[in-house]
Regions:
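Acidic, PIN/NYN-like endoribonuclease modules and their adjacent C-terminal/linker elements
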Residues: 2, 104-134
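Short secondary-structure boundary segments
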Residues: 42-43, 80, 119-120
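Conserved glycosyltransferase catalytic-site signature
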Residues: 7, 42, 100-104
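A generic structural signal for short hydrophobic patches within well-formed alpha-helices
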Residues: 10, 45, 122-123
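Short, well-structured N-terminal submotif of metal-dependent ribonuclease cores
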Residues: 1-40, 53-62, 134
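Active-site neighborhoods of divalent-metal-dependent phosphate/nucleic-acid chemistry enzymes
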Residues: 74-116
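Internal alpha/beta domain cores that form substrate/cofactor-binding pockets in large enzymes
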Residues: 65-68, 78, 93, 123-134
Length: 134
């Protein structure tokens, strides 16, 4: 089973104490140990860089970016076909954000069914299943 890693997973691990921190850490440990086949996208990496640079935390931007690149052997590019599909998802999926629509489109276009995320918005996307984080 291949799992798409959303930006909030490594960001919870790197962040302040939070109820999602330990489940996120356990998941990333499984990825690092190759018990989970993980992938992500260039858009996820962009989100990480954007978030931490906007906070003035370039150290964390680099650290979290490097972690994701290290443990995700596949980083999917975002293409015109993906943004076209994201546009379509926005019109048929109530309440989905543009960012989540791009992630979902990349996943669907690469036949990745599972996502590791704490974002319940993905539950509304047909063809996407959110991994339970425990």
């Amino acid at each position: 089973m291949r799992v798409f890693v959303d930006s909030n997973i490594p960001m919870y691990v790197a962040g302040r104490e939070h109820e999602n921190q330990d489940p996120a850490r356990r998941f990333l440990d499984r990825v690092r140990d190759r018990k989970v086949e993980a992938c992500t996208s260039t858009e996820v990496l962009q989100e990480i860089l954007y978030r931490y640079s906007s906070l003035g935390r370039l150290d964390l931007a680099s650290e979290v970016y490097d972690l994701v690149v290290e443990i995700c052997p596949v980083v999917l590019d975002v293409t015109l076909a993906d943004t076209d599909r994201a546009r379509d998802l926005l019109s048929i999926t109530a309440g989905i954000s543009a960012r989540d629509a791009v992630h979902a489109a990349v996943m669907l276009n690469h036949e990745v069914e599972w996502i590791a995320t704490f974002d319940a918005g993905f539950d509304r996307v047909r063809g996407i299943r959110r991994l339970k984080m425990a």
